[in-house]
From Swiss-Prot:
Organism placement in taxonomy: Bacteria, Bacillati, Bacillota, Bacilli, Bacillales
Localization: Cytoplasm
Protein keywords: Aminoacyl-tRNA synthetase, ATP-binding, Cytoplasm, Ligase, Nucleotide-binding, Protein biosynthesis
Organism for this UniProt entry: Geobacillus kaustophilus (strain HTA426)
An MF annotation (GO) of this entry: transferase activity
Protein family: Belongs to the class-II aminoacyl-tRNA synthetase family. Type-1 seryl-tRNA synthetase subfamily.
Primary localization class, coarse: cytoplasm
Protein name: Serine--tRNA ligase
Amino acid sequence: MLDVKILRTQFEEVKEKLMQRGGDLTNIDRFEQLDKDRRRLIAEVEELKSKRNDVSQQIAVLKREKKDAEPLIAQMREVGDRIKRMDEQIRQLEAELDDLLLSIPNVPHESVPIGQSEEDNVEVRRWGEPRSFSFEPKPHWEIADRLGLLDFERAAKVAGSRFVFYKGLGARLERALINFMLDIHLDEFGYEEVLPPYLVNRASMIGTGQLPKFAEDAFHLDSEDYFLIPTAEVPVTNLHRDEILAADDLPIYYAAYSACFRAEAGSAGRDTRGLIRQHQFNKVELVKFVKPEDSYDELEKLTRQAETILQRLGLPYRVVALCTGDLGFSAAKTYDIEVWLPSYGTYREISSCSNFEAFQARRANIRFRRDPKAKPEYVHTLNGSGLAIGRTVAAILENYQQEDGSVIVPEALRPYMGNRDVIR
């Protein structure tokens, strides 16, 4: 959520920056108009209250002098009724303004490239060289089917499309990757492990920016008003909702494995085969709470930490800075890490690392004090995938496939796979 004071005092500057994102700006224009209406009503109410106080003194004088005060008393009753009606109008306007604030996206950081779509994203760096195959590389779902690692057909029978059963060494590979990633983030980068709930309440979804804008992409349990988490970012960020942290506690780093659940409402016909776009998938999420002045250094560190996983696995990738038109709703700046998938002949997103500045913290009311007597300030929050497990499985199967249909296990992963060096 944007700072209301900045939105009011620097409206045109904020609007200009939001225009760089593209899309509909109706809500921010409506916010300006309703806020003007609210301030006008408040001024009128204050004027009426001042008038009422003056007339009350006149009524007191008339009563002391035993003169007729009824006309003024009747007038003040009418003024009192007007004040009540206007106070109710103000309350309604404030409720609508609060709703509008929740629907206005974050302002892009000045370093974000200006553009309209993913075509305008800017490549920052690459690591590794895509492998040259002496045979036609197969897509991961064909490799997995031949090796008995994944079963999409039976998952469709049990649950529906965009679900999968991991079986045998496929299940072990998934579990190995979870442990491998967590061990690196915990032991080398100092994250604290969190195992979060998979169901959250509405306030949590609002806190991280999933609601109200992305309601159609969430799985909702109507009977209890719970939501299945689309990412561990939601419960882990809300871990400190409505709290004031001590400056000495910052930065806070959390790493969380969880299943993630997404309706993929806008993805009909896209990535219908394989692991790239599932309703349920596993992910290791990295979440940071930091001081505002440190957040952009922390974003660079976060991105490098996610990259480390791909480097250890020997998977070629690139890092791109998202342009303003491709930036997520809550993010001020985002780097996408894209892994090379031979069957696609291109790089596909495997991690998204974002700095939200105070946007989420303001929605979730997460603050800190620089010293015990200082006024609380909003923290900056960051998060990134470290990594998406299913897409990592897909990348390993495709990049390490052999002509005989077997798959080499990346060396760093072998201790987690019972020292197995090949899947056949």
